[in-house]
C-alpha cells in the first residue's frame, strides 16, 4: 500500500484527502477528514461498458450515515441501519445535482457514488465532506468527468457577515444556511434557506462560497495529479448529421408549429404524432437507423426549436413573454373538515394544500447522529401520476418528492411562529393535482395560504417562483415561471421563495458553464418582481392569518404549576394523569419546569382537564369555606375531602356548638358538608370546622 495524502486549509478547518489505503478495488476511493471531527469514505465505481438498453445516464449517489460513527447502536428489533433517512436522501440529491451535468453528453456507462460517514463528533454536518470526497474520488477514477468541483456551506450574521462552513451551533444563530457547489469558473448548485435576506445578500453568499471553495478544487487537482488513474479512452458516438438534416427538413416546420399549441396535452399529442411519423419514415427495415436513433434526433430538433425561438425573442411555448406569470386562481377553505386548506392554480400547475394542527406528542421523532430530536413542523409533497395525465407507480415518497417537500418547507419555516407562542405541531401536505412546471413553488404558495387559513399566526405570507434560462453563445433569456418543457430544455432551474421583505429559500441548478453574476442578478430581479405580483394576488384572497383557529382544530390551553406539584399531577406510576386523560379525552404534556400544555378535541374537554389539574395543585386557603365530602369517620372527628387529594380533619369539638357524643350523630360517610379552613400546619395538615361556617358567612367570607 502506498497511500497518497493531501492536506489543505479550508477556511478555519483542516481537510485531509487520503487515497490508496481503503477500498482499493473501487474505481476511485477517497477518505476525507475534516478537523478530526468528521470522516467520510467516498467510493466511485464506473462500468466499463454502457448498457445498450438504457437511454439515459445511470448515475446513482448514495449517502449513508452509520450510527457507529457517533458511537451509537441503531434502535429497532434488528439493530442495524435500515432504509435511508430523509436526511440521507436529501444529501444524496445534494451531491448528485452538481456532478450530473459534468459527465460528457452521450456518456451512458453506469456510475455509482457511495458516501459513508464513518466518524463524527456531531459538531458539523458531514455533507460538505461527502461532496469534497465525491469530487476527489471522481477526479482520480479516470471516469470522464469535467470536474473537479468544490463545495461550501455559508452562514450569515448581520454583525459579522458571511461565515464559511459553520458548526451546528453557529448555524442555529445564523439567518442563512446555504450550500454552494461548482467548478473553478462556474456555480452549478445552490441550496439554501434564509430569514428574509435581500437578493443582494443571497447573491453575495453564492459568490463568497465560490471564492472560498477554490482551495478545495486546487487540492483535488493536486491529488489527481499524483494518484489519478489514466482517463478512460471514451469517445461520444459520431453524430449522424445527414439524418438530422433530413428529419429537420421534413419535420422542422411542423415541430415549430407544434410548439405554438398552448395546451400541454394537445401539444404533447401533436408532437407524439410527428415523432411517430418520423420513425415510420426514417427508421430502416434493417434497423439502420433504429427507431430509438430517430427519436433521439427528433428530440434534438425539439430542443433546438424551443431554444432558438426563446433567444430570438419569439413568444414562449404558451404565448407569454419572458417576464409574465401564468394566470392565477387562488381559493382557501376549500375542504370543510380540515383545519386549513388552499387550492393554488398557476396555469396548468395546481396544488391542493392542507394544514393540520396536532399536539406536542404528534411531533416527528428524528433519530440522527446528533441524537434524538423532535420536529414540530412537517411539510409533505405528493406527486401522483394523474397530475401529468399518466398511469404510474403509487407508493411511498421518492427522492424527488422528498426533495421538493424539503424545499417548500424551507421556504415557509422562517415565517412560522415560535413554539412558545404557538405550541402546536403542524403538518402541511401538498397534493399536486396538475403539473406543468414549478409544482414545488405552487406548494410554497399553497402552504402559506393553508397555514393562514388554519389560523397559524404567520409572520408574513410567502410565495415562490421558478425561473429558467436559455443561453446560446452570447445570447441569453431569463424566463419567469417556467413550464415543464422549458425546465427540461433550458440551462437553469432557479427557484426563489420569500416574503415582500426578503428571500426565505433559494435553490439553483445549472446545467452549463458560463452563468455570470449578471445573469444571476437578472434572475433574482425578475423573481422578486414575480414574487411581489403573486403575493399581491394571494393577499386579495387572504392577507393575514385568521384570528381564530378552525373549529375543527384541537383546543390548546397552556398553564404552569409549581414544580413541587408535578408529581401530584402525574400520580403514582402515572395513574392520576392517565385518569384525567381518559375521563376528559384530552392529552396533557408536562415539562420539567412545570409548563403544561393541554390539548382537547373540543374546548370543553380541554377546560375539564384544566380544572382537574387546578384542583390537584390548589392549596387550601385559611379562612375559606369549601364544600367537601366526608371520606372517613373516626372517634375523634371526620376527615373531609375539600380538594382533589386533600383531606382535612373536622375535630369532634368543631362539629357543633352543642356537645356531640358521637360523630355519627352529626355526619355520615359520603355526606356533603360546608367546612371552614381554620389552619394548615407546616406538614400540610388541614384543620377544619363546621360549627364556625355560619359566623364566617355572616362576616362575608
UniProtKB/Swiss-Prot annotation:
Keywords of this entry: Cytoplasm, Magnesium, Metal-binding, Nucleotidyltransferase, RNA-binding, Transferase
One Pfam family of this chain: KH_1
UniProt enzyme class: transferase
Residue ranges of domain KH in the record: 554-613
Keyword Metal-binding: yes
MF term (GO), any: RNA binding
Cofactor dependency: Mg(2+)
Gene Ontology, cellular component aspect: cytosol
SUPFAM superfamilies: Eukaryotic type KH-domain (KH-domain type I) (SSF54791), Nucleic acid-binding proteins (SSF50249), Ribonuclease PH domain 2-like (SSF55666), Ribosomal protein S5 domain 2-like (SSF54211)
E.C. numbers: 2.7.7.8
UniProt keyword NAD, yes or no: no
GO biological process, one term: RNA processing
Cell location: Cytoplasm
InterPro entries linked to this entry: ExoRNase_PH_dom1 (IPR001247), ExoRNase_PH_dom2 (IPR015847), ExoRNase_PH_dom2_sf (IPR036345), KH_dom (IPR004087), KH_dom_type_1 (IPR004088), KH_dom_type_1_sf (IPR036612), NA-bd_OB-fold (IPR012340), PNPase (IPR012162)
Main subcellular location of this protein, as a coarse class: cytoplasm
Catalysed transformations (reactions): RNA(n+1) + phosphate = RNA(n) + a ribonucleoside 5'-diphosphate
Binding site for Mg(2+): 487, 493
Protein's job: Involved in mRNA degradation. Catalyzes the phosphorolysis of single-stranded polyribonucleotides processively in the 3'- to 5'-direction.
Similarity comment: Belongs to the polyribonucleotide nucleotidyltransferase family.
Subunit structure comment from the entry: Component of the RNA degradosome, which is a multiprotein complex involved in RNA processing and mRNA degradation.
Identification of the protein by name: Polyribonucleotide nucleotidyltransferase
Organism from which the protein derives: Pseudomonas putida (strain ATCC 47054 / DSM 6125 / CFBP 8728 / NCIMB 11950 / KT2440)
